[in-house]
A protein has these predicted regions:
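Bacterial N-terminal signal peptides that target proteins for export
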Residues: 18-32
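Bacterial signal peptide processing site
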Residues: 43-45
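Mid-to-C-terminal functional-domain signal that highlights helix-capping/loop sites
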Residues: 47-400
């Protein structure tokens, strides 16, 4: 594209952007109205309790009662259209040109195939149903939370966007079908648990994923495929270049759609953290800013869970940090029955026991374990600090 053509295209894109922004402002007004009603439904002030530490049993009960009375249906169900079985293209395909190198993607591996789900697409759709795989890839732009779920709990049915928020977080619903005898259930994303329906209290199993910048994902997996910018829902690839929420993601911006009951001010509200919930209701958070202060790469050993907790999350873990990729990932430290200790050496993750080199994706690049992969802690995910500390109050905060 020449300079003249570029200027013309930029002017056209700017006009379209302003139109989209106006549409999105109207949309946000609906969400703000929804937030006001939802907060009123949750105004009893009872401290959240139970699994996850931030479930808010009394709050959720009140919200369910409001939903059943039809008082909070401000934003229609599926007003934000979830994607189902989108097309995927190679990184160099023209339908992938909506992505910049620094754009964030959720990467997963399925039977040796690598797939990328960009935030750019999920800003607008929030859920991507992968029906053949029985997975739902989800991202809530208001809590910055990336989570991938198995769908066995809902019989493989799809998830849709309910239009409700709980603690500013996406509330999904299961599309059980009009002829089903089963009542649909609401699923607050960061609870990963059913509410207000037949599947009340059912837990969703998470599928391991890696949130990372696009260029670094492609460098790790050049044969990856990515969600096509031509989704067939009236938005061409250029629309996916537009972040629709203005300065919402700025780290120090405390503005949220629903007012925060209280704010844990140990970190900036919109700082990204790698959070790992504890089974007993707590959690541990690794702030990206603190990780960045350690250096370009870091391998941090920790124990994710209570010492007396008989669960996978009480086992030792290691968090790999890559500043350039803006990626933090938690792994188990045992492979093939051997416990490993990691450090950064000569710009690479290395285990002391065998000298094998590992990538940020937990894959051994050289040494005795070449071709092997560490087990990701599937329950670990990236979110904004304010959100993780709302759902898991007073979490352990890792600092160097």
């Amino acid at each position: 594209m020449g300079l003249k053509e570029g200027v013309v295209w930029a002017a056209e894109w700017g006009r379209n952007m302003e139109k989209k922004r106006s549409e999105r402002v109207s949309f946000l007004c609906s969400r703000l109205a929804l937030a006001t009603v939802a907060v009123a439904a949750c105004s009893d002030g009872v401290r959240p309790s139970g699994r996850g530490g931030g479930g808010g049993e009394a709050e959720l009960t009140a919200l369910c009662e409001e939903l059943q009375m039809g008082l909070t249906s401000v934003l229609p169900k599926d007003a934000i259209p979830a994607l189902s079985n989108p097309n995927f293209v190679s990184p160099d395909h023209r339908y992938a040109d909506y992505l910049l190198p620094s754009d964030r993607v959720i990467g997963i591996e399925i039977d040796g195939e690598y797939l990328a789900f960009p935030h750019n697409v999920l800003w607008w759709h929030e859920i991507v149903n992968m029906n053949e795989l029985g997975l739902a890839v989800t991202y809530c732009p208001f809590t910055g939370s990336s989570m991938v779920f198995h769908r066995q709990n809902i019989g493989g049915d799809e998830f849709g966007v309910s239009g409700f928020l709980f603690k500013n977080n996406l509330v999904m619903y299961d599309r059980v079908g009009p002829n089903s005898d089963i009542e649909e259930t609401l699923w607050p994303q960061m609870l990963a648990e059913g509410r207000c329906g037949t599947s009340e209290r059912d837990r969703l199993k998470m599928y391991p994923a890696l949130e990372i910048e696009w260029a670094d994902w492609v460098a790790l997996h050049p044969d990856t495929r990515v969600v096509s910018g031509e989704t067939g829902l009236g938005r061409g690839g250029r629309a996916y270049t537009l972040y629709p929420y203005g300065d919402y993601e700025v780290e120090d911006n405390i503005a949220t759609l629903q007012p925060l009951e209280e704010f844990d001010d140990r970190r900036p509200p919109k700082e990204r953290v790698l959070g790992i919930p504890y089974k007993d209701g707590g959690g541990i958070a690794f702030p990206f800013g603190a990780l960045r202060s350690v250096g370009d790469l870091a391998a941090i050993h920790a124990t994710a869970g209570s010492a007396d907790e008989a669960s996978a999350l009480s086992l030792p873990i290691v968090v790999f940090w890559d500043s350039e990729a803006a990626a933090a990932v938690a792994y188990g430290t045992t492979i093939a029955g051997q416990a490993l200790t990691f450090e950064v050496r000569d710009g690479a993750f290395v285990d002391l026991e065998t000298g094998s080199q590992w990538s940020i994706a937990g894959e051994a690049l050289s040494g005795p374990f070449v071709g092997e992969s560490l087990d990701k802690i599937a329950d670990a995910y990236v979110s904004f600090w304010f959100a993780f500390s709302q759902f898991y109050p007073n979490p352990v905060l890792w600092l160097p």
